[in-house]
């Protein structure tokens, strides 16, 4: 277990080709974010004497909900928290939430943020930090914001995704970004192909390559870092964002 915060731990489980399941642990209870598959989650929880408190679902894609049913079969008292607007596609949810709803999970305040774009009903979960407890804010953002990138627009429009990223960009700059895929290196290589002289992109790319060579993930990042190196966050208007998204969709590394 690693990635310790004050009073809790956030642990990554890399699965499939590039998915990351995040396990948030406090006092022997676990919150699982977007479990693509169940087996490694069950093994980690049982191997560490943990019980499943709840599952947070950002959206309905199979590589985010594929392991949930088996997890609640093993821990039937666990809650599944998902967007009320996605009830027809995440039918096993037991707690349906809406935009700006505030939750209290294991003593931590969580705010639900609607971020349509990748899918029409995508949500993020924002853990509000505090100076008193020395906890940085945390955002579990699924496939909306990636390291140096953003999700493809399978259901939403460029306008929706631009507005969703703008909402995220209004969060505190020290917010830690816990996305659901390890795409950072490829995203930075794409960004460098557009801005080959950008020192921030170049430095982050070198750092990511070094981290990966040592067996570490490139995420979480901080929002302050995304503001410097993520072209989608840097986009000044919807038109610029749409052009970048189209360019990225057609880019071959």
UniProtKB/Swiss-Prot annotation:
It comes from the Bacteria. It catalyses: an S-(2-hydroxyacyl)glutathione + H2O = a 2-hydroxy carboxylate + glutathione + H(+). Pathway: Secondary metabolite metabolism; methylglyoxal degradation; (R)-lactate from methylglyoxal: step 2/2. GO terms for biological process: methylglyoxal catabolic process to D-lactate via S-lactoyl-glutathione. InterPro entries: Clx_II_MBL (IPR035680), Glyoxalase_II_hydrolase (IPR050110), HAGH_C (IPR032282), Hydroxyacylglutathione_Hdrlase (IPR017782), Metallo-B-lactamas (IPR001279), RibonucZ/Hydroxyglut_hydro (IPR036866). Its EC number is 3.1.2.6. This is Hydroxyacylglutathione hydrolase. It comes from Prochlorococcus marinus (strain SARG / CCMP1375 / SS120). The gene is gloB.
């Amino acid at each position: 277990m690693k990635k310790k915060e004050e009073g809790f731990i956030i642990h990554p489980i890399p699965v499939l080709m590039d998915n990351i399941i995040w396990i948030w642990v406090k006092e022997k209870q676990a919150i699982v974010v977007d479990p693509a598959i169940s087996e490694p989650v069950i093994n980690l929880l049982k191997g560490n004497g943990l019980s499943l408190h709840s599952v947070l679902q950002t959206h309905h894609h199979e590589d985010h909900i594929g392991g949930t049913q088996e997890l609640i079969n093993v821990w039937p008292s666990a809650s599944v928290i998902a967007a009320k607007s996605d009830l027809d596609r995440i039918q096993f949810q037991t707690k349906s939430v809406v935009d700006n709803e505030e939750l209290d999970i294991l003593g931590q305040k969580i705010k639900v943020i609607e971020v349509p774009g990748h899918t029409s009903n995508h949500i993020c979960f924002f853990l509000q930090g505090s100076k008193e407890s020395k906890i940085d804010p945390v955002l579990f953002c699924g496939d909306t914001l990636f390291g140096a990138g953003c999700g493809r627009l399978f259901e939403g429009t460029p306008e929706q995704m631009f507005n969703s990223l703008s909402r995220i960009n209004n969060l505190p700059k020290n917010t830690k970004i816990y996305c659901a895929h390890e795409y950072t290196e490829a995203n930075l290589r794409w960004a460098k192909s557009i801005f080959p002289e950008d020192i921030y992109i170049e430095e982050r790319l070198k750092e990511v390559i070094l981290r990966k060579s040592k067996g570490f993930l490139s995420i979480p990042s901080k929002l302050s870092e995304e503001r410097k190196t993520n072209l989608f966050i840097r986009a000044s208007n919807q038109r610029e964002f749409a052009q970048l998204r189209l360019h990225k969709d057609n880019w071959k590394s």
